[in-house]
Amino acid sequence: QQLRYQGEKVKFQGQLKGQQLTVSELDVVAFENQPPVKLVGEFTMPLVPDGLPVSGHATATLNLPQEPSLVDAELDWQENSGQLIVLARDNGDPLLDLPWQITRQQLTVSDGRWSWPYAGFPLSGRLGVKVDNWQAGLENALISGRLSVLTQGQAGKGNAVLNFGPGKLSMDNSQLPLQLTGEAKQADLILYARLPAQLSGSLTDPTLAFEPGALLRSKGRVIDSLDIDEIRWPLAGVKVTQRGVDGRLQAILQAHENELGDFVLHMDGLANDFLPDAGRWQWRYWGKGSFTPMNATWDVAGKGEWHDSTITLTDLSTGFDQLQYGTMTVEKPRLILDKP
């Protein structure tokens, strides 16, 4: 029996002979402005068509968005277990290697491996996922799992773990608890994270809300002469959507320059659908530090906002307690902004 289907985003051609289904062509347009995903394979169908194929082998070819190389995927299974391997043609290590098992009640991925060599910041790790009640559809399935992320920079290796669930993903109302814990290292910077959060809303417009205790920290060297002793981003109560960041955005920076001195800066403000080129972030800032070459201390305070792509300082007051250079001393010089 020949099978053919031609739709707007799907093209299918195959042959069914007894329990054997041969797919000679399956093209699926999965991403806008991208070539279709192409799949071919052979499957053994159950005697009673009330479930998944009994066994099968399928291969697919696809393009990754924003990446030039083609990706090949291969899926094998026999009875209730199998393996999915995804390979980029320009890279020897699999992007995905997922051994899986399936029953009528549960889908399990155990000790899966993944890697992402792109964007100049290679990542890799392990993945385990459990989906209970999967046959009842996405709206009723209970999802939980663990994803580890390994990074490496000049500061050494870093490891972070994302635990998720148990919860559900829904086209209308997702409810999935998440927690990211660990560290990442790139160049001379180390980033530490403890981020409990809740994913909610529809899958087409999700909301990620950070819960009490959510904190990002970092330390290291940005440029040769400036050392970051610590920078902290408290994120409790902050929400992230497709439109941007909402909530109280804060940062506390402690740093030093070996010859010029050390300093502390604070920034605290309210964000509304904020992105670097859209939305609004209104803030105030204050800080103090030392200026060793002139035996001085300094302070700064003010207000400002980041609206769309424009940064505006509305208030600024900064000055030194003194400036000493040789036998000359200047007492309490100060700069105050008259207008934005």
Protein language model features and the residues they cover:
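Extended lipid/amphipathic-ligand handling interfaces
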Residues: 1, 9-19, 27-30, 37-51, ...
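Acidic, low-complexity segments
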Residues: 66, 92-93
